[in-house]
Amino acid sequence: MVQEKKLRVTLVKSKYGRKPGHRECIEGLGLRRMHQTVEVTDTPANRGMIEKVSYLLMIDEEV
């Protein structure tokens, strides 16, 4: 069985004062507060959201 690749994403800057579309991407990734870390599957949709708000995030790739 092949394991899905995961990405560990941490919100390092505040979502307040950002564009509504950027806030929606942050919420779509499951991030609710500063310095919260979540693991998301490495899919094109998640990669797109991460790329859009990459200036607010710290990303660690996992195997």
UniProtKB/Swiss-Prot annotation:
UniProt superkingdom: Bacteria
InterPro entries in the record: Ribo_uL30_ferredoxin-like_sf, Ribosomal_uL30_bac-type, Ribosomal_uL30_ferredoxin-like
Recorded GO CC terms: cytosolic large ribosomal subunit
Iron found in the keyword field: no
GO biological process annotation, one example: translation
A molecular-function term among this protein's GO annotations: structural constituent of ribosome
UniProt keyword Cell division present: no
Listed Pfam families: Ribosomal_L30
Keyword terms: Ribonucleoprotein, Ribosomal protein
Record's subunit section: Part of the 50S ribosomal subunit.
Family of the protein in this entry: Belongs to the universal ribosomal protein uL30 family.
HAMAP family listed in its UniProt record: Ribosomal_uL30_B
Protein known as: Large ribosomal subunit protein uL30
Species annotation: Coxiella burnetii (strain RSA 493 / Nine Mile phase I)
Gene name per UniProt: rpmD
